[in-house]
Structure formats: structure tokens, C-alpha cells
Amino acid sequence: MVNRPPNSSLPTTSAVVKNDTDIPTTPKPTQTSGKDIKQPLLNGNYFKIFHQNIRSLREKHQELLSHLFPNLPHVLCFTEHHLKAFELQNINIDHYTLGAQFCRTSHAQGGVVIYTHNSLHSTTINLSKFCAEKDIEICAVKLEVQSSVFCIITAYRSPSGKFNHFLETIDAVLQSVYSPSLGIIICGDININYLVINEQRKQLDNLLLLYNLVGVADFPTRLTNTSTTAIDNVFIDVSGFYDYVVTPFPNGLSDHDTQILAFRAWYPGQSPGTKFVR
């Protein structure tokens, strides 16, 4: 067992910037269009991570690239890819390499996968021993970008998944990978609605705060005729990421909208004069 980082009280935010003119704050989803949402991400100095519950990656990956091109994210994270392992091996996404995956063997659908841009060097972190179908499906990669090292984790919990098992396993995963010099990013569909305060959200927030991680997506990610929820999220250490923004990116490929995290730099264990902006 490793020691967790000291707990700190951090506000839940949409963006953190060094000054008010560096980067726009997260736009409200009711006031943005797909074109508007892309604007903060066009600066080549940003490192971009994409997550979507894709509800089957089969026959969607080429259309997905057409939505993103030419401003391709550095990392693509998918939950519910719905593919078997051999099928996933046959999915080729131009400009990307398969970095890590989990595929179900006992149940249909589900699964998580991470692709990294061909310009990056990534290492797979083997989390297979932590996976339990429906309760927690998880995979991770480690990336070295200039002088920074990141661990990107993608997680899925089914609506019928056991929450306590999910919570205990996330804790175990974070204990296994945590390092003060490592920038940890968790993205995924955890089926906890972050538009409301509920007991499951409180328990997850309290656990993640032990690792200085907070959810930064405060906009709806799934809209139906009867509900509006934010069951997909991105969790980061807001004290270490410099000039970050997280935005929705509707593309019509799923009933879940994309979240795109973009940031300029990571400062391990410090906050470089940052200012929180809601």
C-alpha cells in the first residue's frame, strides 16, 4: 500500500486560468454550438484528451475523425465500445495507436479503450486484475510529454454495477499508480449524475479528494426526452494543471456527448499562481 497525498479542500471548477485573458472559461452548453466549442482547442499549445461513451465503436471511428479533423486530440478515450478483443484489434483509427483496453467476455456490450496519437510514446498500465464486468471496467496508459508524465485512466460503471465495489476498486487503482510527480487524469462514464448532489457523488468526491482529484465537467453529457444528466466526467488535480478547459463536443454518434479536456502544462505538487474561475 502506498501513502495517499495529503487531503486538501479544492473547489469544484469548470476551468483554471493564470489570468482572465489567457483562455475562455467553459462555455455553457445552452449557449454554444459545435463550432464555438472548438475554439478554445485550436491553439496548438494545448494537449487535448477526448472522452465519449460511444455506444459501439464499430463503424463509427471514421466519421468520428471527420468531426475532429484537422484538430485531432492527442488521446482518444472510449467507454462502451461494445467490441470483443479480436474485433478491437481490427479497428484501425488513422493517426492513432491502440494504447490500452478492456473487453467483456461474459456479458455483451461494455468495454473501455484508449488510443494515443502516433506522435506520442505511451506505455500500457495493466489494470486487468481490477476489472469486474459492469462493476468497474478500466484501463490506463502512461505518457511522457516533454518533461511531464501523465497517467490517463478510462473507467466505466454500468447503471447496474455495484457502487461499493467500484469505489473500493478506484481507490485500489489510484493507490497502485499514485506518485506526486505523476499527473493523473480519470475520464469515463461512471453513471453518477454530477448535476445534482447525491450520496454516491459525495462518497466518490471524498475519495478522489484524497488524491487531489476533482470533477471538472459541470455540463450535461446525456440528454434524452425525459432527462438531462452529467453521468460522464473528467477528474484532474486542478492545483497542478495550468490553463485548462473542459468542453462538451456533441457529434451525434451516441446518446452521450463528448468531453474534451485541453491544458497547456502540468506542475507536479504545486499551483503556479492559478486562479479558479467558475
List the predicted regions and their residue ranges.
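Short phosphate/oxyanion-binding micro-motifs
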Residues: 1-181, 194-196, 202-213
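Active-site glycine-centered loops adjacent to acidic/histidine catalytic or metal-binding residues
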Residues: 53, 80, 188-189, 256
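Short hydrophobic/aromatic beta-strand or adjacent loop that forms the aromatic wall/cage
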Residues: 109-112, 135-140, 229-233, 255-260
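Surface polyanion/phosphate-binding segment centered on an Asp-His-Pro turn
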Residues: 16, 142-150, 238-278
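Active-site neighborhood of phospho(di)ester-bond hydrolases with catalytic His/Asp-centered motifs
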Residues: 76-79, 185-189, 214-220, 235
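Nucleic-acid-interacting cores, centered on viral/eukaryotic replication and modification enzymes
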Residues: 50, 56, 216, 248, ...
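Arg/Lys-enriched, amphipathic patches
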Residues: 35, 150-155, 183-199, 262, ...
